[in-house]
Amino acid sequence: MREEVLTMGKRARQAAHHMAKVGDVHKRKALEHMALNIEGAEAAIREANDKDIRAAVAKGLPAAKVDRLRLDAKVLEEMACGLKEVARLSDPVGEITRMWTRPNGLRVGRMRIPLGVIGIIYESRPNVTVDAAALCIKAGNAVILRGGSEAFHSNRCLADILRRSLVETGLPEDAVQLVGTTDREAVLDLLKLEECIDVMIPRGGEDLIRFVAENARMPVLKHYKGVCHVFVDDEADPDMAMRICMNAKVQRPGVCNAMETLLVHAGIAQRFLPPMAEAFRAAGVELRGCERTRRIVADCAQAVEEDWYAEYLDLILAIRVVNDMEEAIEHITRYGSQHTEAIVTGNFERAHRFLQEVQSSLVLVNASTRFNDGFQLGLGAEIGISTSRLHAFGPMGVEELTTTKFIALGNGQLRS
Amino acid sequence: MREEVLTMGKRARQAAHHMAKVGDVHKRKALEHMALNIEGAEAAIREANDKDIRAAVAKGLPAAKVDRLRLDAKVLEEMACGLKEVARLSDPVGEITRMWTRPNGLRVGRMRIPLGVIGIIYESRPNVTVDAAALCIKAGNAVILRGGSEAFHSNRCLADILRRSLVETGLPEDAVQLVGTTDREAVLDLLKLEECIDVMIPRGGEDLIRFVAENARMPVLKHYKGVCHVFVDDEADPDMAMRICMNAKVQRPGVCNAMETLLVHAGIAQRFLPPMAEAFRAAGVELRGCERTRRIVADCAQAVEEDWYAEYLDLILAIRVVNDMEEAIEHITRYGSQHTEAIVTGNFERAHRFLQEVQSSLVLVNASTRFNDGFQLGLGAEIGISTSRLHAFGPMGVEELTTTKFIALGNGQLRS
């Protein structure tokens, strides 16, 4: 296996050298061609997908998991649309982000270039195969994909279509490669290929991400959990605060940017919490409050220390009443995951300070935490959300799949 | 030990929360105060330094190594000047690098924030203690320093002065901490502190850097070797090319941005190489050439495969004659270290293509490779040169010790 993975790595490196020089017109054509080929291969894709589905059912996988594997007509159409959208994004490669002149006349600048070879290790959903590859290609990279065993046939079929599309548009097929086995050994081999893979992006459960982070020799862009907070200040518009909290908790509770803990200023708690709690209960949300919350909200369960750390990903909410914004920020700093926090307030000074002092990947004023997403923030697409601070912090779009090199234009400058 | 390192990590995290909120006036004052305190403590510093020097001599360290340990009046003055220069750099923290408005009216931007806690593991030179700490502080971070055993007393004395200066200017002393022992166990413990240290920067020999890269759980900003190339095109001005090559090789041969391999276009080799070789020999440079070079340059040694990979860090130069720029770029891609490459040419098209296609941390046209340095490129100061592509590629200044978070300003936006 080691040998096979090494060969893939070397091929990826070669392909990356080629891809770095490809112009945007050519990359757009390839991505649009991928979309056409996926639309044209619906029967073959669904046949491969059926194999995975049948195996998953036979293995006794829970229905929700089986469902996430399914490539029906709607998912395939979304895939093709996604490819066309990525094709239309503006090309980050070659952009000169800044340029300045030194006293000796040397003109120095920074130019955006692809990262090189990107490794993506993911579980379950086969659409990642297409979405992730598209973004890597757009940014001029080569990609090595290693999907989960449950989606093996689907991933294989999709990767073959992407590779064929590259060849048909005159690009190197090895710009997209899928690891041919699903055993864990292959993952370990990949994680040691620091000379061939410039960055590894794990996508999946916390176990997978920790495994990758602990074993990778190359840099890892990773996303642990999202314990997101909304702080309702005493100068908040209560109606706006209720709408934002409801949206942040209920609109899609199973995702990383959903609110998990609500912090309420003591000055508004008496007014705000009773109707808010009623609305949450009507929406089926289980509430777990601090002592002060329980004095205001009848029949609220007692929150224990673990609740403040919890990423429920479910219709459960922890609630705490705090004396002021300082206490709210302290709570966020202590228990939060640096993912997404929002303040609802009409007070300029506090909005300003919350924005400055809360060090999460997205900090919002008067808007729902659910906006922490590449599409929603205007990046066009995303390959994940980084909660570590190096290179990228927050949603990663096509630009985060590039880096910058320095360039210098001289007329004979020497160092003295 | 594990316990002591963990305590340092937690203190650093606390200090980092504080430092992130400190305004630039305050940070400047602290850095200028450090400079004053170093100037005022010359006797104590030299006393501590003498202990290290005596131990190094007793241990039989080579004279060059002993010399690098020495903190004489000149080095101390440079340290103080460095502190004042860093104090005057513009503060990157809080800068909003971009802002845009989404169709729903949400205003989204990116704001520069400190990285948090930075770990620096270094060898030998005690001035790193001061230079590195200053840059970390300026960028609003806390830093944990782990210096080499040879400079133990010097580092301890300097770190104490920095910590005292922080306290005297009302900042948390734990923004600068020095690991109190020099055993390797402590390094391993540090490398596992991913929850407390956001990034690790190793500075020293290749062994140290590999050890850190292989064992760190947090991201690492690292610098392997610099196998730097100059390509002399057939449309180069021969005099300019000679001056640039001489500067790149001879001005300071022992550093990472010195030229190690010279690539010469076949169309200019007959004219260019004989006087160039003569000039190199006059400067004491040993030449190792390819077959074609040896046909032009008398008494040139034969370069073998390893020479193309070599970082000599000495007055030795590998020379290869290539048919065209494509062959030069292929050579650089195959044997280079992505550090620094220069082209000397009067041809616009080739200059343009070389700039685009060579993927090194600094690519120059008509200037010496020796400019790959934070001061020379105008970053004000540097904490090292990164040859890996994530987060930073090339010299790292104060801005590279920050990251950006997303901010969003709304008036009640919800996700639908």
Curated annotation (Swiss-Prot), chains A, B:
E.C. numbers: 1.2.1.41
Key word Transmembrane helix present: no
Reactions the enzyme catalyzes: L-glutamate 5-semialdehyde + phosphate + NADP(+) = L-glutamyl 5-phosphate + NADPH + H(+)
Similarity annotation: Belongs to the gamma-glutamyl phosphate reductase family.
HAMAP family, per the entry: ProA
GO cellular component: cytoplasm
Keywords: Amino-acid biosynthesis, Cytoplasm, NADP, Oxidoreductase, Proline biosynthesis
Gene3D superfamilies according to UniProt: Aldehyde Dehydrogenase, Chain A, domain 1, Aldehyde Dehydrogenase, Chain A, domain 2
Lineage of the species this protein comes from: Bacteria, Pseudomonadati, Thermodesulfobacteriota, Syntrophobacteria, Syntrophobacterales
GO molecular function per UniProt: glutamate-5-semialdehyde dehydrogenase activity; NADP binding
Compartments where found: Cytoplasm
Primary gene name: proA
NCBIfam families reported in the protein's UniProt record: PRK00197.1 (NF001221), proA (TIGR00407)
Top-level lineage group: Bacteria
Protein name: Gamma-glutamyl phosphate reductase
Function in brief: Catalyzes the NADPH-dependent reduction of L-glutamate 5-phosphate into L-glutamate 5-semialdehyde and phosphate. The product spontaneously undergoes cyclization to form 1-pyrroline-5-carboxylate.
Pfam families: Aldedh
Pathway(s) it belongs to: Amino-acid biosynthesis; L-proline biosynthesis; L-glutamate 5-semialdehyde from L-glutamate: step 2/2
